[in-house]
């Protein structure tokens, strides 16, 4: 897969492993659970997203199976620090509410907007993690809202119009639009946002480089070639601002120190988070924390594992 190859090219020294999980799948060796190891999972959310109205019960069950598989893995391993990201829907919230009831000391979750952490877009996602990590994320002060214009200036890009629109319409039939002086709509994998005039007239569709700027990716981050492939990779990524916040919280817990003051990601140079195609679930931790150098004591170990394919079977080690 192209994003997997580009991940290794974008982050020198990272180890990427392509594996098939589930019954009959590959056996992968992960480092043992440790206080300085953070595990992250972003299972495919396409079948669970509210945007997919025609998802069958089988599709939804498959999506939930992947979500539960990742959570069961962390619980069975006894990981000290972990996080899961997915869409926030009544269905996904119900799943995590049940796990929280069964494992109150190990599992908590919250619906968070990446805009509160410095992303130049509205991006509401469900984040699950140990209770201490969720508490720190909820306690972080909201970042100053970053506009599309600011994000593009930081990335060295020109705005192509004074407004943009998504694929939805208002009740009167007019397109849903926003000014470049505001935050963008959520960046999606299936289709990019569209530049338009203030009266809604289409100028052109955003390219993947522009979409990447709205996800806080560095201008130097290499993207897959091809507009559809690039957009799919960017739209399915964990937003860099949220990734940074999660790791800041994880580091604070590990070091038993207050969380460092958060600075919006679009205003500071930083390496972006890994990408994933819709057919992948990935278990990962972001690249070594930005504020922690290799010679410092609190560098978290980082692993990168992209998982291709999935067949769900409950883990026997997790009792109801």
Specify the residue positions occupied by each region the protein language model found.
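Terminal non-domain segments
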Residues: 1, 138-139, 260
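SAM cofactor-binding core of SAM-dependent methyltransferases
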Residues: 1-23
């Amino acid at each position: 897969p192209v994003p997997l190859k580009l991940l290794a090219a974008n982050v020198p020294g990272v180890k990427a492993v392509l594996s098939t999980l589930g019954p009959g799948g590959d056996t992968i060796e992960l480092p043992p659970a440790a206080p300085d190891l953070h595990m992250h999972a972003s299972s495919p959310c396409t079948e669970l997203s509210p945007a997919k109205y025609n998802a069958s019960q089988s599709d939804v069950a498959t999506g939930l199976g992947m979500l539960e598989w990742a959570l069961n893995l962390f619980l069975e391993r006894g990981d000290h620090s972990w996080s899961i990201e997915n869409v926030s829907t009544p269905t996904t919230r119900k799943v995590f509410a049940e796990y929280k009831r069964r494992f109150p000391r190990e599992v908590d979750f919250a619906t968070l907007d990446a805009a509160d952490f410095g992303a130049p877009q509205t991006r509401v996602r469900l984040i699950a993690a140990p209770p201490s990590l969720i508490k720190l994320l909820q306690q972080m002060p909201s970042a100053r809202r970053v506009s599309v214009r600011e994000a593009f200036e930081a990335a060295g890009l020109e705005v192509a119009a004074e407004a943009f629109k998504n694929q939805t319409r208002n009740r009167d039939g007019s397109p849903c639009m926003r000014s470049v002086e505001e935050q963008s709509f959520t960046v999606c994998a299936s289709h990019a946002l569209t530049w338009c005039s203030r009266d809604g007239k289409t100028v052109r569709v955003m390219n993947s480089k522009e979409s990447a700027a709205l996800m806080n990716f560095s201008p130097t981050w290499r993207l897959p070639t091809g507009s559809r492939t690039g957009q799919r990779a960017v739209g399915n990524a964990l937003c860099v601002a949220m990734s940074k916040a999660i790791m800041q919280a994880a580091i604070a817990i590990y070091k038993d120190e207050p969380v460092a003051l958060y600075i919006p990601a679009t205003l500071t140079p930083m390496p972006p988070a890994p990408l994933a195609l819709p057919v992948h679930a990935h278990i990962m931790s972001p690249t070594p924390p930005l504020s922690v150098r290799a010679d410092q004591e609190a560098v978290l170990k980082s692993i990168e594992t992209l998982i291709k394919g999935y067949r769900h079977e409950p883990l026997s080690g997790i009792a109801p």
